[in-house]
Amino acid sequence: MAEEILTNESPELRDVGKPIIEVVNLTKKFGDLLVLDDISESVRVGEKVVVIGPSGGGKSTFLRCLNCLEDPTSGQIFFEGVDLADLKVDINEHRRKMGMVFQQFNLFNNLTVKKNITLAPVKIGIADLRKAKRHNAFTPLYNKLFDKFGAKYNEHIAKKREMLQTKVEQLKTELEPVVEAWEQTKTVEEVAGKSVVSYDPELTKKKLAIANKLEQTERALAHAVPAERRELIPLPAESAKAVREAAEENAMRLLRRIGLEDKADVYPSTLSGGQKQRVAIVRALAMNPKVMLFDEPTSALDPEMVGEVLDLIKQVADEGMTMVIVTHEMGFAREVGTRILFMAEGKVLEQAPPEEFFGNPQHPRLREFLAKVL
């Protein structure tokens, strides 16, 4: 039996069917250009959601918003139930759980293939080890100080939180009518085939000023956290050397699985386009992500190299990985996708399982698109 790419411990293999990404009223603008227009979608554990549509329809921007490589103009993105816009959330902590593969591979040309794959696991693994060691070293002293001053400190924090919460509610009340008036001034114009949105400049300035105060107050509230006793935590590894050895062992396992074990010590410049993209995929998998995001992974490849990359993605999909894939490969979308989204003009105009999507399209724009590409 062939060795699997995903490990048995991979978290994406659990909780199948449970929503892992939820997008609520997502809007993204670049200046006055409306790129994403009030999108609400969800991705469930184990799903392979394929996004297709004409160029300029917002597909790649939507994908980049999912792990906050692009900041949404408005709306919410929840990952495992956590609002990524919440000021208390460590975005980088959640990005670790989302592997992303880009059109142009984005390998480090000054590092060997193996170093490309081990770079992030080693850096993060050692950082986590040091953090755990610091935590355990200072915990006894911290607990002594907490026992002596904790009650008084928490009393002060409670008063501060009450004051900040009151200010937050006041600012929200102040902001609401301004936003309503601002929305009423919205105008949309078609310029060179793109939707350009504009609002009243004075109301925009007033809205941003209040929103900025609200954000600063919410940030202060998020940092006003009551103290509590700490517990010692287990170390994630015995040593930095152990972290490196585990990362290198996993890198070689992944390279062996995709038939590139002999390329471990060469540099990316010596690889073909297809080999580079396969390395980019296993580099993302080396972090043991819960979701994989693919942004047109074959668009920069020569036609004869597309198949080897698609075969690898299919294998990862068959092993249970949750995926969101932007692609122009219609046959691949039909074969791999459990649900297909059609995006155009910044909106999801239609979505359905592959058989229904390709066999019985409903939206006129989708029928027009499929007639051109199939």
Where are these regions (language model features)?
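Helix-to-loop junction immediately C-terminal to a conserved catalytic motif
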Residues: N67
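Conserved ABC transporter NBD signature motif
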Residues: G75-D86, R130, R134-H135
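ABC ATPase NBD coupling module
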Residues: L84-G99, H135, Y142, N154, ...
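Conserved signature/switch motifs of ABC ATPase nucleotide-binding domains
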Residues: V266, M287, E319
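Conserved ABC ATPase signature
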Residues: Y267-L271, Q275
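Catalytic Walker B motif of ABC-type/P-loop ATPase nucleotide-binding domains
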Residues: M292-D295
